[in-house]
Amino acid sequence: MQDIRNIAVIAHVDHGKTTLVDKMMLAGKLFRDGQDNSGEVLDSNDLERERGITILSKNVSINWKGTKINILDTPGHSDFGGEVERVLNMADGCLLLVDAFEGPMPQTRFVLQKALQLGLKPIVVVNKVDKPNCRPEEVYEMVFDLMCDLDATEDQLDFPVVYGSAKNGWMGEDYNKPTDNIDYLLDKIIEVIPAPKQLEGTPQLLITSLDYSSYTGRIAVGRVHRGTLKDGMNVTICHRDGTQEKTKIKELHTFEGMGHKKTDHVDSGDICAVIGLEKFEIGDTICDYENPEPLPPIAVDEPTMSMLFTINDSPFFGKEGKFCTSRHIQERLNKELEKNLALRVQPYEDTTDKWIVSGRGVLHLSVLIETMRREGYELQVGQPQVIYKEIDGVKCEPVEELTINVPEEFASKMIDMVTRRKGDMTSMLNMGERVDIEFDIPSRGIIGLRTNVLTASQGEAIMAHRFKEYQPYKGEISRRSNGSMIALETGTAFAYAIDKLQDRGKFFIDPGEEVYGGEVVGEHVHDNDLVVNVTKAKQLTNVRASGSDDKARVIPKTVMSLEECLEYIREDEYVEVTPKSMRMRKIELDHLKRKRSNKD
């Protein structure tokens, strides 16, 4: 029997989690010394590298002094809560990584709370102690207070602390005495984290994630809860709904470094990949052939936000994407459902080309849209809507805990902005020159808040939010106050026309771009919509007096990210998403029809 430790890494975005895991892999000799390791091995998805966040959870294992350490990477965002809960089910202990300057952040709370409820033993790593102005002692106190708040047990509160800098590759027990490697941390993991319990009996494995290989099809990944799984043995899959299916394991793989390694048996406590099964979902149990005993399935938080997805029916349909039809989008959404636990998809009112897609928040859904866009899909999405529930006859809506960290002089602005959106301030902490303000705010109020907060604080604010609970409906919230500027007809936008219209508002297009009638090309300074003709060229005739010819000076366009577009649009607008561009448009492109329907 090999000695095993299963450990989950918990950290806030950008606190150095992935870097630390990379260094652990170096220590476990997973890279040859000359091999290029361009940083972030775990954030292998392009989107993750660009945004600097972890979305999917990954498994890696290293060998340290004869013990196999399985390292599980968890996402830090509460939008990906479904991912977090799956991973923690496989671990026996957790590594809580905090920044020596910032201390524990709101999202860390979310994952830590789940970990402590599952009874995992924590090791606290205070990272980035080489930063100027860091305060490791205070941060340690903050972590201790946080654990007390989250009802940690006596045993969990007696946690070891390791100080160090993952970037510079050292860890030790005193932050004033840098060492030259991270051995201290690895030794602590083996000493403090309990080995998985060896349970004898019939085999049980709860499927906690899926892998896919074009060669063998779908692969089930999970931790052997009890007994031993063998290569080629007959097993029963118990589905979540109680049905059972007999099948056979073709191959078993364990995780070795970054890849898989074929093996003939896996003992309880180890994490493995099972190949050759068909028809299984996350949360199913693989159990004994003769007398199956399923494990309880994973409970995942319900979605709080939904969006309308539909096919692209704009005049520029099919010019840029490979997959544009409803069949393509339907297949892609079904594929996403297999591995994305917190997602729900329903057809919209008996139509075949519209779907209501629900998820954990704007970020969760925008990552899905962005991934589809990069794969060559064209689609349109509507304004994000909050999912209401009726509890004891009262209409309730999701409320989130919002934390904003800003320099002191902007604090009053922030409080004003959030309270206008029906937020209640719960606490305010002064941390040197910055303040930490906490609010309870309806999820509706968060849509579109980030852009305003960043503008009002000159880009200084750090904002994080997580779902708290459902509370009674708080009343109307005023949304964007400016109207849209809408293109009159299809054609190429000219600098001459844009220049003459610049006093009407700011534009989202550059001269030379193709536009179509009904596309939203800018933001009007007033609250009504304005139809403008940006395709009007200058008449080159001799009729007018020469000489009064001024050069057009066009202010550069406002560039918006996908999240900003989703938060910006109104209910009568769509965001059109194609692999090369993102446009906003009115749902009804025809101006006369739009006018008529407004009169009704």
Where are these regions (language model features)?
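P-loop NTPase switch module centered on the Walker A-proximal segment
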Residues: M1-P104, M142, L210-S213
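Interdomain boundary/hinge elements
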Residues: D36-L42, L150-V162, P196-L206, G242-F255, ...
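Long insertion/accessory domains within large nucleic-acid-processing enzymes
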Residues: F255, H260-T263, C396, I441, ...
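Helix N-cap motif at beta-to-alpha junctions
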Residues: T228, E278-K279, G359-L365, P407-A411, ...
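Conserved nucleotide-binding/hydrolysis modules and their immediate coupling elements
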Residues: Q204-M307, F317-K319, N482, G491-T541, ...
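A short, contiguous, amphipathic alpha-helix enriched in charged residues
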Residues: S314-L337, K551, I555
